[in-house]
Amino acid sequence: MKKKWTLEETKMLFKKPFFNLMFQAQEEHRKNFDPNTIQISTLLSIKTGSCPEDCKYCPQSSRYKTGLKKEPLLEIEQILSAAKKAKDSGSSRFCMGAAWKNPKEKDMPYLEEIIKKIKEMGMETCMTLGTLNSTQAKKLADAGLDFYNHNLDTSKNFYNNIITTRTYQERLHTLHAVRSSGMKVCSGGIIGLGEKKQDRIELLMELSNLSIQPESVPINMLVKIPGTPMADNKDVEPFDFIRIIAVARIMMPKSYIRLSAGRHKMNDQTQAMCFMAGANSIFYGCKLLTSDNPEEKHDLELFKKLDLIPENKTQTLLKEDEYKTIIKSSKIKKDQYYNAAII
């Protein structure tokens, strides 16, 4: 029977002496994972900007002047080319994000074909497209989508300070639709939005007490973008962030805890402490949607220093003729692409 975390239990974890907390987190990590391996994902923005939502941290919102270049939905050849590059670089999962409040029905055939083609390349797939209804979730699942990302971002009580165009309950409904469809859930939050410690406690409680815990939990450090309302937020204290990773590992022992956005601002020592605290997944590549990320070369050097081995490193490379066959076999017609690409 799954443990249900109480407020008092979660508070006690946050109050633990730092090294005691780290020891407990590392123990939990070793019970469920090889401590010397790390899961690598690559994230691509397949449709950038012009989002109608008002998330105060996001440069893709049409409400803020951030200088972001808007881009329509990428053509399937561009997406598959990026997926091949990610696979050849060692990524086992290809994640795709579109700046929508939610996908429209005209988008679904295009999205389904993208999923099928990337699955043929031998990669896990993940998408983040906004809110989903149960019918859309089922279509994506039937196409072969492995994971769907929909973050809770912060606590229910603090949420309306960050976003007003989508309710917290809508986010929970989407997670329910994803879980009911048979897909795996990817859901986490952002640290540094101006939240209090209590909000961090409540966020981790909400995630850990879902009917089934998320298989993947991205923990993001706010990337402060000029032009957004959160551009001047205070920096997150590194040890506070490491503590959150450790508590997340203890509360969700079988989940992959992903060290996500903001990693490019962390030095090697902070990242190493996060891995020690139980983080065992990263995004690999120079961009996370529109935010910077450490260069691949630097990540490989860090892995070497820490003796970390990427998961599924033994996966076979995609041969050029196999890749060309996948491209040619795409059933997407130009009118389907143009219908989906309308902003």
UniProtKB/Swiss-Prot annotation:
Its EC number is 2.8.1.6. InterPro entries: Aldolase_TIM, BATS_dom, Biotin_synth/BioAB, Biotin_synthase, Elp3/MiaA/NifB-like_rSAM, rSAM. The lineage of its organism: Bacteria, Pseudomonadati, Pseudomonadota, Gammaproteobacteria, Enterobacterales. It is an enzyme of class 2 (transferase). It comes from the Bacteria. One of its GO terms (biological process) is biotin biosynthetic process. Residues 36-254 form the Radical SAM core domain. GO terms for molecular function: 2 iron, 2 sulfur cluster binding; 4 iron, 4 sulfur cluster binding; biotin synthase activity; iron ion binding. It catalyses: (4R,5S)-dethiobiotin + (sulfur carrier)-SH + 2 reduced [2Fe-2S]-[ferredoxin] + 2 S-adenosyl-L-methionine = (sulfur carrier)-H + biotin + 2 5'-deoxyadenosine + 2 L-methionine + 2 oxidized [2Fe-2S]-[ferredoxin]. Its cofactor is [4Fe-4S] cluster; [2Fe-2S] cluster. Keywords: 2Fe-2S, 4Fe-4S, Biotin biosynthesis, Iron, Iron-sulfur, Metal-binding, S-adenosyl-L-methionine, Transferase. Pathway: Cofactor biosynthesis; biotin biosynthesis; biotin from 7,8-diaminononanoate: step 2/2. Homodimer. [4Fe-4S] cluster binds at C51, C55, C58. [2Fe-2S] cluster binds at C95, C126, C186, R258. PANTHER family: BIOTIN SYNTHASE, BIOTIN SYNTHASE, MITOCHONDRIAL. Catalyzes the conversion of dethiobiotin (DTB) to biotin by the insertion of a sulfur atom into dethiobiotin via a radical-based mechanism. The gene is bioB. Binds 1 [4Fe-4S] cluster. The cluster is coordinated with 3 cysteines and an exchangeable S-adenosyl-L-methionine. Binds 1 [2Fe-2S] cluster. The cluster is coordinated with 3 cysteines and 1 arginine. This is Biotin synthase. Belongs to the radical SAM superfamily. Biotin synthase family.
